[in-house]
Amino acid sequence: MSGPAASDLESRAKAAQQLAHAPYSKFRVGASVRASGRTFDGANIENASYSLAICAERTAMSAAVLAGARDLEEVAVCTDASPPSSPCGACRQFLYEFAPDPAKVRVTAINGAGERRSWTLAELLPDGFSGRELAVSEPE
């Protein structure tokens, strides 16, 4: 990511991190995705029944899908970790589902200290599995 749009995506991920509900792990995550030219935010939301927690990347992409924005373009993730944490495996797979070309989707991880790491979604999930392998197309 580069330029003002990237800065906006990263700023939104930082703001979303402040809204995380992480009373158990204390690991707050914020995410912002650009899909179909629009931006959507999410934060991790934990639950006392740990398996019911949902990650920031999935809350952001779910908001995009609900708004009809399904073509993933970029992702920014903000954590307090050093170095910044990449998305977990479940989030990588979830995001891959909505990437028209995973090699062109930039995923940037940042933290409050200004550290930054960046990959393509294809680098994070090589040989990923999607509806393309199932020869499934979404209804028009």
Question: PLM features: what roles do these ranges have?
Answer:
Residues 2-22, 69-140:
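C-terminal binding/interaction regions
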Residues 13-16, 56, 60:
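Stable alpha-helical structural segments in soluble proteins, enriched in small hydrophobic residues
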Residues 26-36:
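Short beta-strand scaffold segments in enzyme catalytic cores
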Residues 35-38, 111-113:
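Short acidic-glycine loop/turn motifs at beta-strand connectors
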Residues 37-47, 71-75:
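Glycine/charged-rich beta-loop-alpha catalytic/anionic-binding loops adjacent to active sites
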Residues 44-58:
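Compact, glycine-rich, soluble single-domain proteins
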Residues 55, 59, 90-93:
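Short amphipathic alpha-helical face segments that pack within enzyme cores
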Residues 63-68:
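Alpha-helix C-terminal capping segments
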